[in-house]
Amino acid sequence: MSETDLLVARLSAELGDAAIARELAAIVAADTLDWTAPMIAVPRIQTILGFTFGNRMEANGNRTPGPVNQALAVIAARLAGETGAPVLAQWEVAEPAADLLAGGRVQPIFPGRDGRGEPVYLSTLGVLEEIARITPPASFGVVGVVAFADHLPRCVATARRLGFDAYAPEGIAMPTEYDPLSGQSWCRSRLPYLVHDMMLRLTERRAAMLAG
């Protein structure tokens, strides 16, 4: 039996409903077992999208990119140098990337501010929805996504769902080392993050199902 058949059989036995078991098995496989993203050759990339992963909180309350986002910025700048593609990235990645690229080729994405002037958390989905609200996704052409390795599959999948022609850059190793001092607790170690990522995948799928 295949992995999918085994999952369907288990869920069918648990739920007593073979039809629902098949549908649920497909969801479980996609949202909890799939940790790869479709890839594309680097020379085909026309736009680079960079997603932040955590940050560092200073003693005075200020936020800085931190080591993970600095590593992502290096990758974004390298890809931009190889392809000539512009970089559109959350500010934690855009700020250090701009220091590595000349000519204003990096466009930062900033979060909104609340009534106290504090930044409002901007989710992966929120980033992409904001970009799509301003600019048609198809206008970006082939999009190469730069993101933390465990975050990358969801970034690509979410972008594709919103109409971006998005891929992981082929042959480019994304950062894998978690920052134990991250200002976002779910970005400090792997197991909590993987659970967090699965939760978000399932939450977004639930929302889509309820929206009909």
Per-region residue spans from a language model:
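A structural signal for short, hydrophobic/glycine-enriched beta-strand patches
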Residues: S2-D5, A9-R10, E14, A18-S189
